[in-house]
Swiss-Prot record:
Organism (species): Arabidopsis thaliana
One Pfam family hit: p450
Location of the protein in the cell: Membrane
Transmembrane segments: 2-22
Single GO MF annotation: heme binding
GO-annotated cellular components: cytosol; membrane
Enzyme Commission code(s) on record: 1.14.-.-
Intrachain disulfide bonds: none
UniProt superkingdom: Eukaryota
Chain sites annotated for binding heme: 460
Homology family: Belongs to the cytochrome P450 family.
Membrane topology: Single-pass membrane protein
Protein name: Cytochrome P450 72A15
Length: 512
């Protein structure tokens, strides 16, 4: 009896170990090699598979080397920001595959194929290969299928253009405060001085999202912004170890810190949402900020079709992060580029004077700023907030003339596409807002070659919000100052989820 029990136990253990070894080999070797063979058979070129790590190590080595050297102001930023994808593009052409660990990732640069990926939202879904990436915020940007459709339907009213116009006074108040601080700094030095505008722009855009989303000030939401900024840095560091199975669950110092920061954000937001819900019940809650509009839209849903409190908090986290991050980087690169191109700075300032005169900027006037719109589009083309978007395929499907197997990912390289001379001409790396003088459709030849906010059904819901806020900020800045590059400025764009200035943005501000 004892022998038979021991034998059974050993057999079970061996079976479990064998099954685990087989699953591991399947994941680390057999499936990747099968997918690689499938792709190469169709004529797709790409890198050979390195077990487990794929191309991650090579990618990060090249990125570290690129970041060690700053750029000239006139340089294309691609070699510093996306050196590995750029090298792959030069080596393999416009469609190729690389490896995110054991997962093949097919990069496509053909506008028709990009359009197809954006349009087929149920076939090309958000990947979930790096769970830590959602610790900052899940929300609408990370959902798929019916959940994405439901959240989009509920959130849409908050970003209706008429609702956003009502938020313009809040834009004005937040922007005016930071411009006033810069004015004081310059006045204290005489009529001009060096200002690192990056911290001020971060503070300004954070204050805007606090006021417009939650009816509060930056100081009340400051802790959330601090924690999300810390999380962004930790996630970028953790990304280097993404190929280690189960890494996100290991109790490392950085993982523990990420989870603690995420819990603290959750507690703060739960307090904000619960306080607003109690105020609504008492008939005292404002309904003109994003949270108020969102709650109202959610309540209008039929029983069971609304969002849970947890869902609401995830959307609030996304409001905080995306709402602040996208506009702050758009503004900092706009100021850097206008410092370099004084002719466009003068044209933008003249337009602001013509439209507003001595009046304060309002929604109607901001929408008349054609030159400013051209400038912002060109900044978004050269410095898109994120450098690429990724989609996952879970079943075999066609993309153009390719047949793609389930289990691969698609990379849409925003930066490379928007800098591509084949799509944008020989001056693709140069700052030339005139390319947008006849509108987006003419500039892109009606192709999907400009997608800083994504495209199609999943286009960024906050696009109009970000652009109107940026116009308000630039209108106030241009009326008060002229500005140029400081000798101490180091041109070093780098990615912390979005493209940041690595060493700040030091400009010489002249009071007008």
């Amino acid at each position: 009896m004892e022998i038979s029990v021991a034998s059974v136990t050993i057999s079970v253990v061996l079976a479990v170990v064998s099954w685990w070894i087989w699953r591991t080999l399947q994941w680390v070797w057999f499936k990747p090699k099968m997918l690689e063979h499938y792709l190469r058979r169709q004529g797709l070129a790409g890198t050979p598979y390195t077990p487990l790590v794929g191309d991650l190590k090579k990618n990060f080595t090249m990125l570290s080397e690129a970041r060690s050297k700053p750029l000239k102001l006139t340089d294309d930023i691609s070699p510093r920001v996306v050196p590995y994808p750029l090298q792959m593009f030069k080596t393999y052409g416009r469609t190729y595959f690389t490896w995110f660990g054991p997962i093949p990732t097919i990069t496509i640069m053909d506008p028709e194929q990009i359009k197809e990926v954006f349009n087929k939202v149920y076939d090309f879904q958000k990947p979930h290969t790096f769970p830590l990436a959602t610790i900052i915020a899940k929300g609408l940007a990370n959902y798929d299928g019916d959940k994405w459709a439901k959240h989009r339907r509920i959130i849409n009213p908050a970003f209706h253009i008429e609702k956003i116009k009502n938020m313009v006074p809040a834009f004005h108040q937040s922007c005016r405060e930071v411009v006033g601080e810069w004015d004081q700094l310059v006045s204290d030095k005489g009529s001009s001085c060096e200002v690192d505008v990056w911290p001020g722009l971060v503070s300004m855009t954070a204050d805007v999202i606090s006021r417009t989303a939650f009816g509060s000030s930056y100081k009340e939401g400051q802790r959330i912004f601090e924690l999300q900024a810390e999380l962004a840095q930790l996630i970028i560091q953790a990304f280097r170890k993404a190929f280690i199975p189960g890494y996100s669950y290991l109790p490392t110092k950085s993982n523990r810190r990420m989870k603690a920061a995420a819990r603290e954000i959750q507690v703060i937001l739960r307090g904000i949402v619960n306080k607003r819900l109690r105020a609504r019940e008492a008939g005292e809650a404002p309904s003109d900020d994003l949270l108020g509009i969102l709650l109202e839209s959610n309540l209008r849903q039929t029983e069971g079709n609304g969002m849970s409190t947890e869902d609401l908090m995830e959307e609030c986290k996304l409001f905080y992060f995306a709402g602040q991050e996208t506009t702050s980087v758009l503004l900092v690169w706009t100021m850097v580029l206008l410092s370099q191109h004084q002719d466009w700075q003068a044209r933008a300032r003249e337009e602001v004077k013509q439209v507003f005169g001595d009046k304060e900027p309002d929604a109607e006037g901001l929408n008349q700023l054609k030159v400013m719109t051209m400038i912002l589009y060109e900044v978004l083309r050269l410095y898109p907030p994120v450098t690429q978007l990724t989609r996952a395929i879970h079943k075999e499907l066609k993309l153009g003339d390719l047949t793609l197997p389930g289990g691969v990912q698609i990379s849409l390289p925003i930066l490379l596409v928007q800098h591509d001379i084949e799509l944008w001409g020989n001056d693709a790396a140069e700052f030339n807002p005139d390319r947008f003088k006849d509108g987006l459709s003419k500039a892109t030849k009606s192709q999907v070659s400009f997608f800083p906010f994504a495209w199609g059904p999943r286009i960024c819901i906050g696009q109009n919000f970000a652009l109107l806020e940026a116009k308000m900020a630039m209108a106030l800045i241009l009326r008060r100052f002229s500005f140029e590059i400081s000798p101490s400025y180091v041109h070093a764009p780098y990615t912390v989820i979005t493209i940041h200035p690595q060493f700040g943005a030091q400009l010489i501000m002249h009071k007008l």
